[in-house]
């Protein structure tokens, strides 16, 4: 998988450094602390959080993406790491982060470590593609798609601050989006 993303990130036309709107909403309501950006790509969300004073750990399997992030974050508090999450190369330490974000990367066995990695009172913010997207939309592999309600169920017992399912304006792929606070 890194090969595909390395090629994708090598084309400047594919790089948009605008943070995900859901993350902006979260960051505006929290004081800076420690954040984890999973499957960060070239780091648009990590850069945004760091610009607000967050200490960010950003993880991705793409050396090209992490290289771009490292270049752009030289003066910011970003620890950019190359790690294959599917192989367990980045263990998430319990109670380490005030904020964990995961946008459009699904690895179901990461949810338990993610929940443990968020400090009590901390927040998870994320969005995952749904199986009922438009025909031809990507990703197509069912392993990378959630069923309606599945993301909400992963955070049962947490305070759900925001939850929605549907397509964003201008997008064909439907997604589940969540902001949840650990009790």
Regions found by a protein language model. Name each.
Residues 1-30, 33-41:
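Conserved class I S-adenosyl-L-methionine
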Residues 55-60:
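Conserved SAM-binding motif I beta-strand of class I
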Residues 62-64:
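Conserved SAM/SAH-binding beta-strand->alpha-helix loop
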Residues 75-87:
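Conserved SAM-binding strand-loop segment of SAM-dependent methyltransferases
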Residues 90-99:
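A short acidic, Gly/Pro-enriched loop at the edge of an enzyme's catalytic core
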Residues 106-117:
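A short, conserved alpha-helix within the catalytic core of class I
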Residues 122-129:
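Conserved beta-strand signature within the Rossmann-like core of class I S-adenosyl-L-methionine
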């Amino acid at each position: 998988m890194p090969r595909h993303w390395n090629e994708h990130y090598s084309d400047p036309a594919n790089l948009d450094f605008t943070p995900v709107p859901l993350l902006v909403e979260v960051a505006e309501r929290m004081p800076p602390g420690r954040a984890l950006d999973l499957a960060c790509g070239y780091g648009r969300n990590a850069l945004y959080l760091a610009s607000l004073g967050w200490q960010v750990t950003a993880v991705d399997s793409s050396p090209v993406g992490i290289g771009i992030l490292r270049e752009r974050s030289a003066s910011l508090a970003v620890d950019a790491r190359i790690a294959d999450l599917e192989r367990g190369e980045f263990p998430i330490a319990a109670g380490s982060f005030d904020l964990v974000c995961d946008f459009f990367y699904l690895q179901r066995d990461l949810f338990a470590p993610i929940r443990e990695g968020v400090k009590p009172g901390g927040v998870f913010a994320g969005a995952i593609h749904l199986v009922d997207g438009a025909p031809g939309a990507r990703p197509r592999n069912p392993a990378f798609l959630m069923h309606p309600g599945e993301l909400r169920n992963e955070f049962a017992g947490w305070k759900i601050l925001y939850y929605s399912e549907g397509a964003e304006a201008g997008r064909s792929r439907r997604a589940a989006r969540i902001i949840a606070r650990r009790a």
